[in-house]
Curated annotation (Swiss-Prot):
Lineage: Eukaryota, Viridiplantae, Streptophyta, Embryophyta, Tracheophyta
Oligomeric form and interacting partners: Interacts with the PYEL proteins bHLH115, bHLH104 and ILR3 in the nucleus. Binds zinc and iron ions.
Binding site for Zn(2+) 4: C1076, C1079, H1090, C1097
Biased composition (Polar residues): 895-906
Gene from which this protein is expressed: BTS
Name of the molecule in the record: Zinc finger protein BRUTUS
Triggers of expression: By iron deficiency, specifically in the root vasculature (e.g. pericycle). Destabilized upon iron-binding.
UniProt-listed SUPFAM superfamilies: CHY zinc finger-like (SSF161219), RING/U-box (SSF57850), Zinc hairpin stack (SSF161245)
Biological or metabolic pathway of the protein: Protein modification; protein ubiquitination
Site (Required for iron-dependent instability): E108, E369
Length: 1254
């Protein structure tokens, strides 16, 4: 399942601005990974065309990776369904892909994301963390591949599932980069900066991998795309011809660096040959971009072979590395002591940079030993523990420096920091010296003994190629600067002799850099007669070589060194914008990274700089080196707390060791989601041999999970993430997770499609099997059809297993990163009250039916303590609502609950609820004989008890008192009609007849509701169509929640209240489209929903659709009123106009700007003559036009002479400020807000200047 590259709009020129939120990349790379369609803009990189963003070259890599993942997963599926597949070849191709992808990710972390984080915060960290998750997937896959048991069917399926999960995860990650990262890079960086970033990216990949990386991409894309890639590289690689030759030699696959650096030719070749868009003999057909239109004959000089007559063994050069590193560490330790003595912070950044440099050198040196030297030696040597210890010590050292920087010079702990600084420096130096000594006495003697002179030279060259170009450019002059002249010359001899002949340009570059470490760039060749490759390169003869714009600069020739070096400084214009900043030098690299310095003897070497160590964008390098070393040793992903960026250091400092916050309850849903994902993953393995019942149950569980996941992701996208983004420091932090939700929703949809097809196929197979049993025929045609169906069913079942595995891994990774990155942000940036509001906002958009299903689903995945904490948080967020009452009624009415107290979730709450029910039974349905026996004093005593009960709501008290006072009359009314009815009609009940909403059409119901039943009122035991019909003819109100019986108006049978008629003759006749078991509400006409927080049924589509419940106001509001002014329990009052209780009113209610409410009809009538709130007196809307009219009126009005100098003190009802204004008999304008909604608080005569406010 390859992820197609999105259609992007061409981003031209320097820093093209993205349209909307996503910049579109060229359609030339928009074809899917499996497409070989020619590119429509193959010449868009030409000099005549407008410039296209260099960032787009990454799309070629994405396409190559997606194509290879798709091809490998297809092989794994074939293997799982019984086809023959060479597992060895599959394993090698995956190993190659992993190596390529790992180095790409490391370079991305070092360069791309570091650069992006400079301009756009809160984006890079998520993608870096995803790299670690993908590394874990590769680890798991290789565990399977290394334990191959081809005969085990479960192994085959697990392999297919794992390859599918890897493909899905990587494809989604790359697609997100294309939608978010690339557009941001194009938008925020100029063209020259983009080219610099891509060039530094290439220079940050180890040389031995870059030699594989470029030709593999080129072989994985179409011919036109390959040409476009070459043209793009011309614009990216600096114009110096030597650099162009190095890169395009690799791109054409002409270099032997791959073979020389222990990357198997067979593995590389098999990956090239198996690529879906492999171009045979590509190197022979496609020219290097530095060559002309015709392939010329190029005569490369033979690299000087200095023979092996020297007594020194080349492998002893490892001691030179050790010596230089020890020297540098000693200088660092001395510098630390100087800082301690002086207490000067000014050089701390330079000190930190120097430490980073030597740490990177040590890490790559250790990597070279682990991957090149030690495996070649026959002895079983491993210094991985020493290497890990050194890396950890360097990391601790850098963290200490960061702490010193953050503490500041005035810190009282500065002295302690400096002491630790010296101690750490001495400790690292001691560790390194001990480690180097052990290597020199254990490993080097065996290497001298077992390897020929030539082999030792080759190993040294391979070790150097473990480093990236960016580091080699700094290391070689640094190393040669610390050597004697003889040591430096021998080092250069061995370097040149150990390289393959095809690497002439690369060795030339290395040699020139090495010479820069000597005084005045002195050439290190034994004499000045041209043996130095930098000099001999100028003798290259080109036949029929046409000039190339990308290679316009002339290499160093026999001209004067001065003119050569002057020419080197003439870099292409596109680089000057980036490289014009001042070069930074560190104490260890003075005069080393400054390019060549001509000398008078004409023997200086001049080669071009890469231009990436002048770090204008301040990109890091050490973290990528650490990541490479970690992954190379034990194939495990780096620890999550090994920072890729400095700002990650405190990423784990939140969320642990603190009391659980309200928002944590939202993340409790992650546990339930993970539990169901595990269920789908495991149970999907049983789909091949199962019955129809199992498939139906599996589909049901899948739909349940899909629904709850959708509700959860919508809550995050609509509420949680916008809350995070509202904080200025957290912009962009959630965009990646929003993209995850869209991708995961598509995965659910894909699974649903396959599951539906699988279910239909299973039914067909069962039907065919039954038909065969009946007909007892066994024709050849039937056998063929059944065989094809069974084969297709097995393929679909295997595919579905992989998809379930993929969605489990994808969602688990998504959940893990959310909890790691986003969860701590709520504790850091949101107060408890803000978190309560967020929780209330989320559950306030969740309907009763969803909550009723969701709560048991979530709590089943939690411990008892977690359940209690979650419910406490929910009740705190809903403290102003009826949620607790609804919760009790739901648990009481649950079909799974019994009448016993022990089966109820909350015994204490149920006891309270039972007490209310007992009181209700005693107060609302008394026996009439008992009522008649109560005297007036006893009745008054009961009423006083109600008034004194502080646990009762005031509305409840009024209702109970009213019923007590009318109880004698109610009892009499209950007795007399029953007796009369019994005397006249025997068992016939009053009202036992149908009523009609539309008598002509025979539609059941009443004037208030369309429904097919009547309700028996608990208060008077009579049948009424609805409570309004009851209240209309009675002097008391009907409590519909106490209704237990109903009458079906079709069969006229009284039965327990429910959604359908239980009489057999009615055959499940529905009482209404909407039935609420709590409110006992039936409505067959309107859209109605039950709000669990109002604990009432309201007209509307539902919470989260067209309404939400505000937990502060305790009312349901339209979705457009999200940003309203809250007043606690504002709807639990009477309408200020008609005095009807608003909370239970069925009429439309209008929210006023001040936060109060009134009926919409009352508002219309009231505003005909008033414009202020009848409760608080504030203006009911924007009165600017009206106030402007009053301004004009007063301006035209002239006061009598005796009132002109009189002023009045006023209080503004709108802004609540006091002020002074000129006298008027009616209108007084507020000097602060300009409102005329004011009142006079004092009148007096003062000087004319009286237009003030306070």
């Amino acid at each position: 399942m390859a992820t197609p590259l999105p259609d992007f709009e061409t981003a031209r020129g320097g820093g093209a601005v993205a349209s909307s939120s996503t910049t579109v990349l060229p359609s030339s790379v928009s074809s899917s990974s499996s497409s070989s369609r020619p590119l429509p803009v193959a010449n868009s990189f030409s000099d005549d065309a407008e410039e296209i963003s260099p960032i787009l070259i990454f799309l070629f890599f994405h396409k190559a990776v997606c194509s290879e993942l798709e091809a490998l997963h297809r092989l794994a599926l074939e293997f799982a369904t019984g086809h023959h597949v060479d597992l060895r070849l599959l394993r090698e191709r995956y190993r190659f892909l992993r190596s390529i992808y790992k180095h790409h990710c490391n370079a991305e972390d070092e360069v791309i994301f570091s650069a992006l984080d400079i301009r756009v915060k809160n984006v890079a960290q998520t993608y870096s963390l995803e790299h670690k998750g993908e590394s874990n997937l590769f680890d798991h896959l290789f565990e399977l591949l290394n334990s191959a048991t081809e005969t085990d069917e479960s192994y085959r399926r697990e392999l297919a599932r794992s390859t599918g999960a890897l493909q899905t995860s990587v494809s989604q990650h790359l697609a997100k980069e294309q939608k978010q990262v690339f557009p941001l890079l194009i938008e925020k960086f100029k063209y020259e900066e983009q080219a610099y970033i891509v060039w530094r990216f290439l220079c940050s990949i180890p040389v031995n991998m870059l030699a594989v990386f470029l030709p593999w991409i080129s072989s994985s894309i179409s011919v036109d795309e390959s040409k476009e890639m070459q043209t793009c590289l011309k614009k990216i690689v600096p114009g110096e011809k030597l650099l162009q030759q190095v890169i395009f030699t690799w791109l054409g696959g002409k270099s032997n660096t791959v073979a020389s650096c222990r990357i198997e030719d067979s593995m590389f070749q098999c990956c090239l040959d198996s690529s879906s868009s492999m171009l045979p003999c590509k190197a022979s057909r496609e020219q290097c971009a530095c060559e002309g239109s015709k392939i010329g004959k190029r005569k490369y000089p033979e690299l000087t072979n200095f023979g092996s007559s020297d007594t020194l063994h080349p492998v002893d050069e490892i001691k030179l590395w050790h010596k230089s590193i020890n020297k540098e560490m000693k200088e660092i330790a001395d510098e630390a002591r100087k800082i301690q003595l002086s207490g000067d912070f000014s050089d701390l950044s330079a000190f930190d940079e120097r430490l980073q440099y030597i740490a990177e050198v040590c890490i790559f040196h250790s990597l070279a030993e682990d991957k090149i030297i030690f495996p070649a030696v026959d002895g079983e040597f491993s210094f991985s523990e020493e290497h890990d210890e050194e890396e950890n010590q360097f990391n601790e050292f850098r963290c200490l420096i960061e702490n010193i920087k953050s503490a500041g010079a005035s810190s009282t702990s500065a002295a302690e920091f400096y002491t630790k600084l010296c101690s750490h420096a001495d400790q690292i130096m001691e560790t390194i010296q001990r480690h180097f000594h052990n290597e020199e006495i254990q490993v080097l003697p065996l290497a001298r003994k077992n390897f020929s002179f030539k082999r030792q030279q080759e190993l040294l060259y391979q070790s150097l190629c473990i480093m990236p170009l960016r580091l080699i450019e700094r290391v070689l002059p640094w190393l040669t600067a610390s050597l004697t002249e003889d040591e430096a010359k021998n080092f250069l001899k061995n370097l040149q002799a150990g390289a393959p002949k095809s690497d002439v340009a690369l060795v030339t570059l290395f040699s020139g850099w090495a010479c820069k470490g000597r005084k005045a760039g002195e050439c290190l060749s034994p004499n000045g007669n041209g043996l130095c490759p930098v000099k001999t390169l100028s003798n290259i003869k080109e036949v029929n070589l046409q000039s190339c714009n990308a290679c316009a600069s002339v290499p160093c020739t026999s001209r004067s060194t001065k003119s050569c070096c002057q020419h080197q400084d003439k870099r292409p214009a596109k680089r000057t914008a980036v490289l014009s900043c001042e070069k930074k030098t560190t104490p260890h690299s003075t005069e080393v990274a400054n390019g060549c310095k001509p000398s008078g003897n004409g023997r200086s070497c001049c080669v071009p700089d890469l231009g990436v160590n002048n770090n204008c964008l301040e990109l890091g390098s050490l973290p990528a080196a650490k990541a490479m070393r970690s992954s190379s040793l034990n194939s495990a992903a780096p620890a999550l707390n090994s920072s890729l960026f400095i700002w990650e250091m405190d990423s784990n400092s939140f969320g642990t060791g603190h009391a659980e916050r309200p928002v944590a309850t939202i993340f409790k849903f992650h546990k339930a989601i993970s539990k169901d994902l595990e269920f789908l993953d495991v149970e999907s393995g049983k789909l091949i041999d199962c019955d129809g019942t199992f498939i139906r149950q599996f589909i049901g569980r899948f739909h349940l999970l899909w629904g709850f996941y959708k509700a959860h992701s919508n809550a995050e996208d609509d509420i949680l993430f916008p809350a995070l983004e509202s904080k200025e420091t957290l912009h962009n932090v959630s965009h990646s997770y929003t993209l995850d939700h869209k991708q995961e929703e598509k995965l659910f949809g894909d699974i649903y499609s396959v599951l539906t097809e699988l279910s239909i196929l299973h039914e067909k197979l069962q039907s065919d099997s039954m038909m065969e049993d009946i007909a007892q025929t066994d024709t050849v045609r039937t056998d063929i059809d059944n065989g094809d169906c069974n084969k297709k069913y097995n393929e679909l079942a295997t595919k579905l297993q992989g998809m379930c595995k993929s969605i489990k891994i994808t969602l688990d990774q998504h959940i893990f990163l959310e909890e790691l990155e986003l969860w701590p942000l709520f504790d850091k940036h949101f107060s408890i009250q803000e978190q309560d509001k967020i929780v209330g906002r989320i559950i306030g958009t969740t309907g009763a039916e969803v909550l009723q299903s969701m709560l048991p689903w979530v709590t089943s995945a939690l411990s008892e303590d977690e359940q209690n904490r979650m419910m406490d948080t929910w009740k705190q967020a809903t403290k102003n609502t009826m949620f607790d009452e609804w919760l009790n009624e739901c648990w009481k009415g649950s079909p799974d609950s019994s009448s016993t107290e022990t089966s109820k979730p909350s015994p204490q709450k149920d006891n309270d609820h039972q007490e209310i029910l007992d009181q209700s039974g005693e107060l609302f349905k008394p026996g009439w004989k008992d009522i008649f026996r109560m005297n007036q004093n006893e009745l008054e005593a009961e009423i006083r008890k109600v008034y004194q009960d502080s646990t009762l709501d005031p509305r409840r008290k009024d209702y109970l008192v009213q019923n007590w006072r009318t109880s004698r009359w109610i009892a009499a009314q209950q007795k007399l009609p029953k007796e009369a009815e019994t005397a006249v009609n025997g068992d016939v009940e009053l009202g036992c007849s149908p009523s009609f909403r539309d008598p002509e059409k025979q539609i059941y119901g009443c004037e208030h509701y369309k429904r097919n039943c009547k309700l028996r009122a608990a208060c008077c035991d009579q049948l009424f169509t609805c409570r309004f019909c009851h209240d209309k003819v009675s002097d008391h109100s009907m409590d519909r929640k106490l209704v237990t019986e109903m009458l079906c108006m079709r069969c006229l049978k009284v039965q327990p209240v429910g959604p359908i008629c239980t009489t057999p003759s009615c055959d499940g006749f529905p009482m209404a489209k909407h039935y609420c078991s709590i409110c006992k509400l039936f409505d067959d006409e309107r859209a109605v929903y039950h709000c669990p927080f109002c604990n009432l049924c309201r007209v509307g589509e539902g919470l989260g659709i067209d309404f939400f419940h505000c937990m502060t106001c305790n009312c349901c509001l339209g979705m457009k009123l999200v940003n309203h002014k809250c007043l606690e329990k504002s709807l639990e009052t009477n309408c200020p106009i008609c005095c009807e209780f608003l909370f239970t009113s069925s009429e439309a209610v209008r929210a006023l700007p001040c936060g109060h409410y009134m009926h919409s009809a009352c508002f219309q009538a009231y505003t005909c003559s008033h414009y202020t709130c009848p409760i608080c007196g504030k203006s009911l809307g924007d009165m600017a036009v009206y106030f402007g009219m009053l301004d004009a009126l007063l301006a035209a009005e002239e006061l009598p002479e005796e009132y002109k100098n009189r002023c009045q003190d006023i209080l503004c009802n709108d802004c609540e400020r006091k002020g002074t204004t000129r006298f008027h008999w009616l209108y007084h304008k507020c000097g602060s807000c300009g409102s005329y909604n004011t009142r006079v608080i004092k009148s007096e005569t003062i000087p004319p200047d009286c237009s003030t406010s306070s």
